[in-house]
Amino acid sequence: MSNKRETFQSALWRGDFGNDYIGRNPASAANVQAAAMLWAQILLRMKGAPPRSILEVGANVGINLVALRALSGAELFAVEPNDQARRGLAEASIVPQANLLDGVASSIRLADRSIDLVFTRGVLIHIHPDDLLASCREMHRVAKRYIVSIEYFSANAEELTYRNQANALFKRDFGAFWLDNFPDLRVLDYGFAWQRLTGLDNLTWWAFEKSG
């Protein structure tokens, strides 16, 4: 298990920058429904062995977890660095208090292979490239069977200004990054959520299964 290390990016999300994000992205019925439609597609790829435990790394206010609670009987876990977001998750009883962890992707206080499905949505894009491998290693360590990443895609690694903030958004082919660094992963499927039809922000998703 990695030692907790604050980075420029994690400090952003713990502070006002992260609080502002919460205000822009509530767990509204429309947002939850859009997430549920996407997750219904992804979970279909796991129907032969559905996950009994699910961890979201960077859960924020729990849009995905609310959707997953309606779709799955799995026990839910969340890692989230922002205090305000964690309070919201606790007050709404989206995950049990014991399963709600203060942390970041590079430091997950859970045992090896303890969670069937570990995922991110719009989180890897906010991790500096120098810290990305350590973060993915932690997710891989904790995942027992499945890893899912739902992120912005770019064929080439690039940094973009995000909400007038430099050093906060990094796009790449995250699917290739997973496969290049973790040879025990196999692709279950991948897809694209087109904003025009789904209401989601042109997201690419990859679903992997561990072979070991």
Q: Can you name each region flagged by the protein language model?
A:
Residues 1-109, 130-134, 141, 145-212:
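Class I (Rossmann-like) S-adenosyl-L-methionine-dependent methyltransferase catalytic domain
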